[in-house]
């Protein structure tokens, strides 16, 4: 080939975000086709300052990056970690190494990340950088209809894994300083006991679930006692991308096919079905980004916003509502960053119905506590459990019944609410029913050692039902329900119809999302000083 026909050199930059893994990573595989390559993770101030970010999230990400940097270095790929706004960091790095292609996975994130991506796209166009994004979940961009969505999901999940089959040529020799630490980022220790970070830990967790722990999955997932061991515990790894959804799906299908135990196969099929729901809820945010900030059903606007009780909110955040199961679950979540789904739903239901708190402040608090915070799932579930979708069944949990059903021996409550350690079991779910003599024997004076119930269970539940069902019977609510159903409601088979992603980025949309993201990053939230 003559010199005039030679292919010009191309330099790829792999932009890592919530895909902190080596295996089944399409951007890394694509980078092998370029002359040379390097990778980058950006610690963005917009992330650190966002109201849903917690130090534990940063800590987990740094742990993932430490392992990934070593793995990529063994293949000749440098991994840079830089601090700053995305466009600023990319522009500076472009000046240093003149990369020609930007490779990354698609992301369905909170408002600030969408605004960031719009800005990065504009910058890439201005300097003639080709930015290629790859899918990594079942979420479909610019989706016009949910018809066929299940087939697309299945096709993506059944496609061959994207595995690295070669070595990289390092772009240039760059100084790679040590990874930042929480201290160097100005972040205080979080004090949580977190799951192990990184792809190796993720694979161990997946293996143990599919081989042993998942046997009682269907029976054990509702109780916080048994769910801790019998749930997959993969959610943080899916959230930070140390495992791909496709890897989990295919490994699960292999395990189902290979086990001779029909009961185990049945349990794993239940888990496999939830993988598709994972992407289904993410699709809701992809289709309608405003659900992070606004009610699905706008007829619910004003329902709770003007009645926010700061004292109730503080008690709920701190696990001192006087309802033992609520308090035990909240304290456990704060300490570990994880809680099983039913108990998460109970916490939200109690806040939304018993305490009549709006889902946005409570959702931000929980987002910071959940190590596995996934925006699409989180905000969809916050609204479902708060009754503001306009179409889903109203789920109102009795904290007393949940204690009796899910912690019948009181082991979970006694572990996380030590004030109740000596309370007799018949009173443990409702300690306020002890007479004073029993309280003294149990060393638990209600109102002194442990709070009295913050609200009356039956009175609060009745008031919430009256308001919610009254609203749903209104003409406006019925009319809007049809529209919400068309955009987000479930079809037969559990695959709901959906609207379409913003196909183009209008200036008005960008300004609105940017304004909301900026306001909530700079304005102290009402819960901001409780768990810094």
Model-derived features: positions:
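Active-site "lid/cap" and pocket-lining segments within catalytic core domains
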Residues: 2-272, 282, 389-532
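Active-site-proximal binding-pocket segments
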Residues: 233-425, 532
């Amino acid at each position: 080939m003559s010199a005039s026909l030679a292919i010009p050199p191309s330099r790829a930059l792999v932009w890592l975000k919530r895909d902190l893994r080596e295996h089944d990573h399409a951007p890394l595989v694509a980078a092998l086709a370029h002359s040379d390559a390097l990778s980058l993770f950006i610690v963005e101030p917009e992330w650190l300052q966002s109201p849903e970010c917690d130090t534990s999230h940063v800590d987990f990400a740094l742990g993932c990056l430490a392992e990934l940097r070593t793995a990529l270095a063994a293949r000749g790929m440098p991994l840079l970690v830089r601090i700053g706004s995305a466009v600023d960091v990319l522009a500076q790095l472009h000046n240093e190494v003149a990369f020609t292609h930007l490779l990354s996975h698609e992301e369905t994130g909170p408002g600030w990340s969408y605004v960031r991506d719009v800005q990065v796209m504009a910058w890439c166009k201005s300097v003639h950088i080709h930015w290629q994004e790859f899918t990594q979940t079942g979420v479909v961009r610019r989706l016009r209809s949910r018809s066929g969505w299940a087939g697309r999901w299945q096709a993506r999940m059944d496609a061959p894994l994207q595995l690295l089959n070669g070595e990289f040529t390092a772009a240039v020799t760059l100084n790679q300083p040590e990874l930042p630490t929480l201290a160097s980022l100005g972040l205080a220790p979080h004090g949580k006991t977190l799951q192990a970070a990184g792809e190796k830990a993720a694979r161990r967790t997946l293996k143990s679930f599919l081989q042993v722990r998942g046997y009682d999955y269907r029976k054990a997932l509702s109780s916080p006692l048994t769910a801790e061991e019998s749930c997959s515990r993969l959610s943080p790894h899916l959230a930070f991308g140390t495992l791909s959804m496709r890897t989990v799906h295919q490994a699960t299908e292999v395990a189902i096919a290979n086990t001779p135990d029909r009961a185990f196969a049945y349990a794993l099929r239940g888990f496999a079905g939830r993988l598709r729901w994972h992407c289904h809820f993410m699709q809701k945010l992809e289709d309608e980004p405003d659900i992070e900030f606004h009610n699905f059903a706008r007829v619910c606007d004003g329902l709770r916003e003007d009645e926010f009780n700061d004292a109730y909110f503080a008690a709920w955040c701190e696990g001192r509502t006087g309802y033992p199961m609520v308090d035990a679950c909240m304290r456990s979540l704060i300490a570990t960053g994880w809680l099983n789904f039913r108990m998460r739903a109970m916490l939200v239901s109690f806040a939304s119905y018993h305490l009549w708190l709006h889902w946005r402040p409570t959702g931000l608090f929980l987002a910071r506590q959940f190590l596995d915070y996934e925006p699409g799932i989180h905000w969809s579930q916050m609204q479902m459990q708060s009754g503001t979708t306009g179409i889903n069944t109203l789920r109102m949990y009795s904290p007393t019944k949940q204690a009796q059903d899910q912690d019948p021996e009181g082991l979970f409550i006694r572990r996380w609410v030590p004030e109740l350690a000596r309370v007799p079991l018949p009173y443990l779910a409702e300690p306020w029913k002890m007479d004073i003599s029993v309280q003294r024997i149990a060393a638990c004076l209600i109102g002194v050692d442990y709070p009295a119930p913050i609200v009356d269970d039956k009175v609060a539940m009745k008031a919430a039902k009256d308001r919610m069902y009254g609203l749903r019977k209104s003409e406006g609510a019925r009319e809007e329900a049809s529209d919400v159903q068309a955009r987000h409601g479930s079809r037969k088979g559990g695959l709901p119809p959906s609207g379409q992603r913003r196909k183009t980025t209008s200036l008005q949309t960008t300004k609105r999302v940017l304004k909301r993201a900026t306001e909530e990053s700079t304005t102290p939230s009402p819960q901001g000083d409780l768990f810094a």
